[in-house]
Amino acid sequence: MTKFVFVTGGVVSSLGKGIAAASLAAILESRGLKVTLLKLDPYINVDPGTMSPFQHGEVFVTEDGAETDLDLGHYERFVSAKMRKSNNFTTGQIYESVIRKERRGEYLGKTVQVIPHITNEIQAFIEKGAAASHDGKADVALVEIGGTVGDIESLPFLEAARQMSLRMGRNHCAFVHLTLVPFIASAGELKTKPTQHSVQKLREIGISPTALLCRADRPIPDDERAKISLFANIPQDAVISVWDADSIYKIPQMLNEQGLDRLICEELRLDPKPADLSMWQKLVNAQENPEHEITIGMVGKYVDLTESYKSLIEALRHAGMHTATRVNIEYIDSEELESGHLEVLAPLDAILVPGGFGKRGTEGKIRAIQYARENKIPYLGICLGMQLAVIEFARHLAGMADANSTEFNLETEHPVVALITEWVDREGKVEQRSADSDLGGTMRLGAQRVPVKEGTKARAIYGAEVNERHRHRYEVNNHYVPTLEKAGMVISARTPTENLPEMMELPESMHPWFVGVQFHPEFTSTPRDGHPLFKAYVEAALASQQRKGA
């Protein structure tokens, strides 16, 4: 039977519950246990797919095409299990499911209430999510409950966790509570009162934490831990100090050294082998002792909020670990490039345009792409970044000065990028598509296997086949591909059934390293294995740096 560890948060949000849960899961996995993770989001949105990145950060896409919380990206980077749609659910999904059941008469005319109907549904969703990995035989499922204790939105989830613990009995559920211990500079001391109140609030709900993770900007002294232990009624060895680290990959070792995994295993009556964190130590060592250093310019419109590009930033760091390179990222606001200021691109070793939606800032991105192409700076375009590379190429090298995407200009004379429902086929006819003819109707989501053309950079990077995840509404218009290819562009991967361009590149005679991909490779990069595309990109940046210095 799967055992559960519920991870809750108190005092303030954004303390790093996702990193803490993923780190504990990584330690338990290193002890030989089969682990999986779930994220419960208290907001009423059905999923984060239509939420602004400024509000919610990155939307992480799973292999089965679910648009989920960015914490699922952390989970996949820390453990071997692949996340699925059932690993993340929201209040919106719970209420939607309960209301559908009520309409179908499944409650036999009873008054539908938060307790028991909503809380029972939450428990059913938790058990379904835990069974999605390891053929339903996970040893431990870590369940992160979003929000903070005391939020009205979180109450049904906390109540469901309490009921689940009661129903399953002792030694089947553990609770880890993450809280803040702020340092007050004017007083010169750490303050434990917010943590005391947070634990009291949790105990009022009926939950007593097995362990307390105390976040601070510095290690918490033993006397403060003893004070927290006394007032929170938790053994002192269960009060874990979690201070700010310069790398999230140091957290598993930090928690292991203080015995968090031992406490959890004792509570759940598990007796696995000792933890082996040598892989994490090796990765941290590679990160802290690079032989090279490069600067990559990331040109986007969400550059003030790096949470919007969380997986991409981590993928570049992974590539750095596997190439002994410190990867510095320069965030460049694409709107500032629209009025000039291209000189900020000159010192860069490589340029990257990530995915995105909407017209704002696109002309600045196109100018950055043109600069990269003309100045032979390594370029990687992801999703929108590939589409804009096609537009830039069509305008300046293929004789289509008005080339654009119908996302930005419905009246463009040359729609080289078009909506999934309005492609022009090889005969010049508008081809209408539906949910039956394309994954997700107007949004292509999830993983897809695609063959790769021989003799291309893509083939050297990926081999014969690429299997990556998608999240987009627009595609390169096949009607214009022959013209683009005649001008020198190489379409190096196409979907097997629709024949849609998945990867584009420029030949070495035109540019040393210029690649665009319609998919999102950042979602499959892990610190353990890195990612072949990002590794090749960093190596191209190093080669460019050497050419500049020669």
UniProtKB/Swiss-Prot annotation:
Enzyme class per UniProt: ligase
Binding sites annotated in the UniProt record for Mg(2+): 71, 144
Subunit description: Homotetramer.
Cited CDD domains: CTPS_N (cd03113), GATase1_CTP_Synthase (cd01746)
Catalytic residues, chain numbering: 383, 520, 522
Pathway, per record: Pyrimidine metabolism; CTP biosynthesis via de novo pathway; CTP from UDP: step 2/2
Protein's recorded name: CTP synthase
Functional note: Catalyzes the ATP-dependent amination of UTP to CTP with either L-glutamine or ammonia as the source of nitrogen. Regulates intracellular CTP levels through interactions with the four ribonucleotide triphosphates.
Anything else known: CTPSs have evolved a hybrid strategy for distinguishing between UTP and CTP. The overlapping regions of the product feedback inhibitory and substrate sites recognize a common feature in both compounds, the triphosphate moiety. To differentiate isosteric substrate and product pyrimidine rings, an additional pocket far from the expected kinase/ligase catalytic site, specifically recognizes the cytosine and ribose portions of the product inhibitor.
Gene: pyrG
Annotated region described as Amidoligase domain, given as residue ranges: 1-270
